[in-house]
């Protein structure tokens, strides 16, 4: 689905986000999105590490 979005579509989405939230809110939104992605990656890494360790114990 997202692979069909070209460069013009991406620009359109970014402009729509800018209009919706305004330039003052964008850094806050970006920061919270980054923290969310960081936490998600950390959780998935911990789950895979736990699963790998349990597999080695058996």
UniProtKB/Swiss-Prot annotation:
**Pfam families xref list:** TatA_B_E
Which first-to-last residue range defines the signal peptide? none
Q: Where are the transmembrane segments?
A: 1-21
Q: Which domain of life is it from?
A: Bacteria
- How does this polypeptide assemble, per the annotation? Forms a complex with TatC.
UniProt KW keywords: Cell membrane, Membrane, Protein transport, Translocation, Transmembrane, Transmembrane helix, Transport
Q: Can you provide one Gene Ontology molecular function annotated for this UniProt record?
A: protein transmembrane transporter activity
Alphabetized PANTHER family for the sequence: SEC-INDEPENDENT PROTEIN TRANSLOCASE PROTEIN TATA (PTHR42982:SF1)
**Family note:** Belongs to the TatA/E family.
The record lists the organism as Bacillus cytotoxicus (strain DSM 22905 / CIP 110041 / 391-98 / NVH 391-98)
Q: Where in the cell is it found?
A: Cell membrane
Q: InterPro entries, alphabetically?
A: TatA/B/E, TatA/E
Q: What is this entry's stated membrane topology?
A: Single-pass membrane protein
Functional note:
Part of the twin-arginine translocation (Tat) system that transports large folded proteins containing a characteristic twin-arginine motif in their signal peptide across membranes. TatA could form the protein-conducting channel of the Tat system.
Question: What HAMAP family does UniProt report for this protein, alphabetically?
Answer: TatA_E (MF_00236)
What are the GO cellular component annotations?
Answer: TAT protein transport complex
One GO BP on record is: protein transport by the Tat complex
**First-listed, main subcellular location of the protein, grouped into a coarse class:** membrane
**What Gene3D superfamilies is this protein classified in?**
1.20.5.3310
Please state what the protein is called: Sec-independent protein translocase protein TatA
**Taxonomic lineage from the root:** Bacteria, Bacillati, Bacillota, Bacilli, Bacillales
